[in-house]
Amino acid sequence: MGPYCAPHPLSLLVQAAALAAALAEGTLPAFLPCELQPHGQVDCNWLFLKSVPHFSAGAPRANVTSLSLISNRIHHLHDSDFVHLSNLRVLNLKWNCPPAGLSPMHFPCRMTIEPNTFLAVPTLEELNLSYNGITTVPALPSSLVSLSLSHTSILVLGPTHFTGLHALRFLYMDGNCYYMNPCPRALEVAPGALLGLGNLTHLSLKYNNLTEVPRRLPPSLDTLLLSYNHIVTLAPEDLANLTALRVLDVGGNCRRCDHARNPCRECPKNFPKLHPDTFSHLSRLEGLVLKDSSLYKLEKDWFRGLGRLQVLDLSENFLYDYITKTTIFNDLTQLRRLNLSFNYHKKVSFAHLHLASSFGSLVSLEKLDMHGIFFRSLTNITLQSLTRLPKLQSLHLQLNFINQAQLSIFGAFPSLLFVDLSDNRISGAATPAAALGEVDSRVEVWRLPRGLAPGPLDAVSSKDFMPSCNLNFTLDLSRNNLVTIQQEMFTRLSRLQCLRLSHNSISQAVNGSQFVPLTSLRVLDLSHNKLDLYHGRSFTELPQLEALDLSYNSQPFSMQGVGHNLSFVAQLPSLRYLSLAHNGIHSRVSQKLSSASLRALDFSGNSLSQMWAEGDLYLCFFKGLRNLVQLDLSENHLHTLLPRHLDNLPKSLRQLRLRDNNLAFFNWSSLTVLPRLEALDLAGNQLKALSNGSLPPGIRLQKLDVSSNSIGFVIPGFFVRATRLIELNLSANALKTVDPSWFGSLAGTLKILDVSANPLHCACGAAFVDFLLERQEAVPGLSRRVTCGSPGQLQGRSIFTQDLRLCLDETLSLDCFGLSLLMVALGLAVPMLHHLCGWDLWYCFHLCLAHLPRRRRQRGEDTLLYDAVVVFDKVQSAVADWVYNELRVQLEERRGRRALRLCLEERDWLPGKTLFENLWASVYSSRKTMFVLDHTDRVSGLLRASFLLAQQRLLEDRKDVVVLVILRPAAYRSRYVRLRQRLCRQSVLLWPHQPSGQGSFWANLGIALTRDNRHFYNRNFCRGPTTAE
């Protein structure tokens, strides 16, 4: 955002009137500064608004059904803010005035909502007030269906807060009292406070420090979320009337802190306590969450009567031993999803894991999550009880430290679709010896770091090219310790269709024998390895292979003098997608790729520029891909792209990506050699202008992306002849304008014209504004992302905030001319007057300047009686004699009208007052406190008391009033004196031994007593005390 220049109020008035007139005519976007989206949604997010925008009467306000004001700075909501939106149904006000604990700078904020703010919107159905500093529930309309009051400061819910909300079905009040949003007490829900909400079905009260289940909840509830409170005891009466409950979440109330990723309170000993009949009356319950509850065992009575239970989350407990012998699953025949993740033993990794035989009773189970249990060997005994499950489709075993895995066991599962073994330590197939051993043998391991959990797979760089693994059977072995692949690993896995082996250390030369058992494999991911592609028959054992990812296998290609054979591509009859991205391929590879089936090739992140620099050796590298449709040549260090290079690309190409190269020139006429090309991506290059010719006629180009270049000029008619062009991206360039002549009649057919992030010149009457307004439906982010680059006052601001003062105005021009003429006249007159009567002006100036300090000093004399109080040791007769006969005479008698007023103890102190009263009055009635010292090694008595009062004055008034006069400079100086000499030298004066230096001493002493000490401080060390305003 550029610098802000505050406009004149009259200019703002004229600007507002002009904008209002334009809106009334329907020329500007209707909901400035917000953006209208489909289906009546108005987006006002992240605009730093301080009040709700009141849209113009010309805008179709009756069509607005959703208004989003997320992350603004609205602290006050008025009764009239939403009155004009007669059909508003959804209102989102998140993150406008967050509580102090949730604010990025921890500033306190309190949002004010007037009584009729929401009552004025009788159609409102969904209201989100989360992350705002509100302390009570505002008055709400009876039409409300969904209400979110999460992460606010509301700590009390009473029966009167929701009066009349008979249509309310969803209520969210999470995070009103927890470590990120601290509070003086837990959320208090009065008994029966929500009982009047007869249609409430979803209630969420997570993270509120609740210690018990709120009493007398509505019986209509089907979802109750109470996780991460402090409810450590559950009894039947807590959920007595909730017979319609379908989902219950009470996890995280008695936490397992060794696996917590945030502040955690240890679960008390012998807790939690769940009564055997706690859930027995919840006959409709389908989902139960008991995660992170410090459970060591499960009571069979807990699940009595839960015949409909389909989802059970038992993760992050201590059930590592219990799952090997439990019989609790015998009655859960309807269970579809079971989560047992992170039920590990502290600091222990088991050699084997044998699931209890009762798992075989889960005949409806579809998904089982067992990651983070920590066992080292996976054999047929481990999952034997699961092989009989007819519906099991997804099995998660990642992050278990498994180092030996018998993968063939998955062939016995009749319906298995996905097995996740990623993030383990598998180095090969389990041997018979590894399958034997003691069941309870264990190895100590260190505790997992907080928050460690399996993350998503790295996104493929060309995600549009490679298909996903949503197939019948997928096995994920990514992020393991595989170095070689043997066909024995995949015995009995002929049904496998997708195999992920990315992020291993596979460095062998694949020769066509590694994947022999996988006759049905269609997708193979070998990215992020070290594969040696030397054999011409690599992967030929996979006749149905359709997608092969060999990206990020750069190490073999970086080895000097080693050749690489890519001829295997021609021998894969079903291959359609191939990624060779980011391998640094530059030399000693097959001279030509051939395939009749390949449709998409990702060759980004290589060095095609070096390959094409070798004469004609690799000129036809891609020409043998006869049916190629998509080709990615991004990040190949291409500085030029000759017509012969394009001419030797497959003629079947429809999409060509050349992003992030170094192209400074592109021959647009050469696009005719690619007759079927529909999408061309040239983003992130170094194009300076679109001036060398124009897009040729007759091409099929529909999408052109030249964003993130440095284009500052486009010749007229450049896009005219590309009659099929419908999407054009010109964003993030150096364009000063958008000229309609670039497009001609094509402007009316463009569906997307992106010109955001260009430094547009917002001069008054700029033609591009009218053009963009005519095509505003096709311009994404017109109201917010299309901004000005000049003039400086408007830099970074929307093109619709144009300052009308920059328009040509005759009156303003005359005023500017007169002002400039006056400045020229002054520029001539001032030097002339200085030459003729400069001394007189100098004298008058300094006379006035001298008068001002005197006036200030006269005003100060009314409050300060003395210029300085003199403090010395009367016991030392020599010092007293010097003070009375030298110091007093010099400062009071010999300075004439500049004489100073000194306060001396024996002369000016009042009799009858105590010593301290006189001393305090003297110090606080004097401008300076002067200490006359014979030595500085140690002081006491009156000197010490006076020094402490001077320091007290420094703290109270922020004034340094200390002046030190040392009569014997050669004596030892204390550390304080030496430090003061370094910081404020002029306030420490030394009596000269030679009479010739006494005149200078008295002059410096007079300056030290009449000027403020803060002027004397050495600016290299400090600025000195500043006077409080």
From Swiss-Prot:
Signal peptide: 1-24
Gene Ontology annotations of biological process type: activation of innate immune response; canonical NF-kappaB signal transduction; defense response to virus; inflammatory response; innate immune response; positive regulation of B cell activation; positive regulation of B cell proliferation; positive regulation of immunoglobulin production
Pfam families assigned: LRR_1, LRR_12, LRR_8
Protein name: Toll-like receptor 9
GO terms under cellular component: early phagosome; endolysosome; endoplasmic reticulum; endoplasmic reticulum membrane; endosome; lysosome; plasma membrane
Lipid-substituted positions (S-palmitoyl cysteine): C257, C264
Taxonomic lineage: Eukaryota, Metazoa, Chordata, Craniata, Vertebrata
Family, per entry: Belongs to the Toll-like receptor family.
Name of the coding gene: TLR9
Residue ranges, Cytoplasmic side: 837-1029
Protein's organism: Bos taurus
